[in-house]
């Protein structure tokens, strides 16, 4: 009997040999004829057939009969015979240990293997991280719900109170580490994402409410260092400026104290009028010397200030010289003749000063020195105004001249005489060969007019011999 459609002959005897004893292996050598194309050869093969349980073989036998029944009666009879042969040669043992004892020694099972086919009970599970997952058992596929879908969805007041407590304790640095976040997540039964989000929102809320007591964490250390360096440099710069201000104040105080001391020394003296601060060069002492502090000249007319502004820029007066200025101005303010007052203003704008030795030119500072008592009125041009600055060593002489001028300035001025003087000032580039100098002289005593006029006429030749160049007044404000 053969099934040519299957490609191999079917013998009446079974090709499967299963030993009756389950302890031995079921590997037997049999002969099998296989037709390959036109030739057929008999080959010997070894088949190993394991033992099966009754419930497995019963189902396979019925399925085999149903499958072979479609081929008609001849095949159905063969299928029935084959099913009977299978049933005869397979042992049906209720003991499952007989199945595993037939395996090779390398697959031996320990004692108690019979419990494998008993009902499977759920073993106790071990959770290494989160104990809250221990109450959830494995599902039918053996997986665990690690997504936290069964955990708390939103934070309650109890959980947020724990987080708020930690935030208050660490308000100087409200950035919890990874371990602290894990600890807080376990305590509050929240996820790490929820804890991190809560702290981020809390920091943003505190920053918006201007309750920030920590330095931003995202700011690099170099930026912090640069900020500190800039603050230190700014403090040092302010310190240097304050030191400079202190030094200037000290210098001004020293200078003012020297001026006051020299003025106090010269007050009680009643020495005769000196001709010059420098004994080598004769200088006229006919014009009174009085300091004109610009700060104390508030009530003066603006044209007088313009005359002062037309003069070259000179040294600023010391702040403490106002006490002497008030003494000088009190005489002018108490004067009842506005004409004399106007003469004094004009004389202050165009005062003629003496020369220094060999090119050293001397011009009074803001003290506005006027040598002697005579008050000239400048006519067309100014002749004899020289450039230069007063030496600090001449402060005492200046104060003495000022005191001498105070003694005669309050006297009533007698009638003046008008004279025209020829002053040869060829050294000044803007002038002609001779300059007209009209002066109105007011003098307290008679008999000095001619001598003082001659002294004034000798001034221009002296200037020309000394080769000193008069400078042009420049407006500086």
Swiss-Prot record:
GO cellular component: nucleus
A Pfam family this chain is assigned to: Homeobox_KN
DNA-binding region(s), chain positions: 148-210
Keyword DNA-binding: yes
SUPFAM superfamilies per UniProt: Homeodomain-like
Comp. bias (Low complexity): 310-321
Record region (Disordered): 209-282, 303-323
Compartments it resides in: Nucleus
Protein name (record): Iroquois homeobox protein 6a
UniProt cross-references to SMART domains, sorted A to Z: HOX
GO BP terms: cell development; neuron differentiation; regulation of transcription by RNA polymerase II
Function: Transcription factor. Binds to the iroquois binding site (IBS) motif of target genes to regulate gene expression; functions as a transcriptional activator or repressor. In concert with irx5a, plays a role in visual performance.
Disulfide bonds listed in the record: none
Superkingdom as given in the UniProt entry: Eukaryota
Family: Belongs to the TALE/IRO homeobox family.
Keyword terms, alphabetized: DNA-binding, Homeobox, Nucleus
Source organism per UniProt: Danio rerio (Zebrafish)
Start-end of Basic and acidic residues biased regions: 219-237, 254-264
Record field: compositional bias (Acidic residues): 243-253
Molecular function GO terms recorded: DNA-binding transcription factor activity, RNA polymerase II-specific; RNA polymerase II cis-regulatory region sequence-specific DNA binding
